[in-house]
Amino acid sequence: ILSTGGSDAARSALSCGKKIISAGPANPTFIVDETADIEKAAYCIHKGASFDHNITCISEKNVVVVQDILPKFKEALERLNVYYVDSIGEMLKLSKILLNEDLEVNRLYGGKSADTILKDAGILTDRSYDLIAVETVRIHPFVTKELLAPLIAIVKARDFECALQIAIEAEQGCHHTAGIHSSNSERLRRAAKEFETAIFVKNGCSLDGIGICGVGSTSFTIANITGEGAVTAKDLVRKRRCVCVETLRSYA
């Protein structure tokens, strides 16, 4: 049985007594540190987070940015058709429609366009946008919940150490997808090791991690629960081994 759909689906599948390949919850979080190529980082994050209105489980949901480069990162996003929210008023308007009274996600907006969300929130714009970025705090539901909508949470961090701590906390141990934009090889290595996610992307877009833009076969199912990672045809077929021991040559 191939199970997708989060924790509840995984629990049901795992109790059925058959072989299971199970995907689980996700909250993909990416870091942008002060050594990153800011323009490239913004481009990659926009590309991944705006893909299919951010309804895929691997698309960037949160971005933790070192504070020294946040102004330049914001400008880079705004040049890429991203509506950037850094006012409490607009954040509250978005929270009102995207979250229910109990602060759980309003699933009615899953997969809706950024323009629809902005319009329903009462935020007037003079152009069309394909992604919303909201600067907020690490404990806001936009950070801790997977919205499955074209909105990413931007969290400011004092330095790389702080960014790594916030990002791991935001990913919540799902071990699904994460990434980092940095030119520091030690930070690239360390982040990959500490996240322990099935998909980890260094200096690229989340889509690079599943073969759409990068290398390898394409997979939209990430089995972070049972450990297969990016599921391919090889995980779904019967495996056979054929062995020829002796040579076929004749030594007459």
Ranges and model annotations:
Residues 1-13:
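Glycine-rich phosphate-binding loop
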Residues 1-2, 26, 66, 117, ...:
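Buried hydrophobic positions in well-ordered alpha/beta secondary-structure cores of metabolic enzymes
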Residues 2, 31, 64, 152-154, ...:
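Structural motif
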Residues 4, 23, 66, 202-203:
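Generic beta-sheet signal
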Residues 5, 36, 68, 158-159, ...:
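Short beta->alpha linker loops
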Residues 7, 69, 206:
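Flexible, active-site-proximal loop/turn residues at the rims of small-molecule/cofactor binding pockets
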Residues 10-138:
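ALDH superfamily catalytic-core signature
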Residues 122-252:
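Conserved C-terminal structural/oligomerization subdomain of aldehyde/semialdehyde dehydrogenase
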